[in-house]
Amino acid sequence: MRKLALDLGTKSCGFAISDLLGIIASGLDNFIYEENDFIAVLAKIDEIMINYHHEIDTIVLGYPTNVYDGSKNKRTYLIESFYTLLKQHFLNHEKIKIVYEDERFSTKIATQRLKNSCVKAAKIKKVKDKMSAVVILESYLSKNHFN
C-alpha cells in the first residue's frame, strides 16, 4: 500500500506519495489554496485517494516544532487542529492510519537538494513544499519500512 505525506502550511500544501512497496517517495503536487482553507486540502486528499484507487493506507503529516528544543510553536497547534479534522474526515475509513512525522529541517533539506540539482530560485519557490513532503515521507519510510 502507498503512503501519502503532507507538508501543510497556511496557504499551500506539498504532497508526496510512495510506491506500492513503500520504498520510494515521489513529489506529487504543490497545492495552493486560500489562507487556512483546510476543507480545500481535504478535498485534494480525496481527489488523490480516487486517483490512486484507494491504495493509500497511511497519511503522514509533517509535524513542526522548534528546531533547537522540539517545543511546540504556532504552526504545531495549526497542524494538530488539522490532524483532528483529518481524523474526523476519515472516521469511517478504519484502514487509513494518520501519523505525525518530525519535519524539522525538511524545507532546508529540500531546498538544498533543489539547489544541488541546479534548479533556479523561481522554480524552487514553486516546488519546495512538494519536495519537503518528499523529505518527510522519506524519513517516515526509512523508520517504518518493515512495519
Curated annotation (Swiss-Prot):
**Keywords assigned by UniProt, alphabetized:** Cytoplasm, Hydrolase, Nuclease, Ribosome biogenesis
Molecular function via GO: nuclease activity
Q: SUPFAM superfamilies of this UniProt entry?
A: Ribonuclease H-like
Q: Which family does it belong to?
A: Belongs to the YqgF nuclease family.
This protein's name: Putative pre-16S rRNA nuclease
> Does the record carry Nuclease as a key word?
yes
Which is one Gene Ontology cellular component term of this protein? cytosol
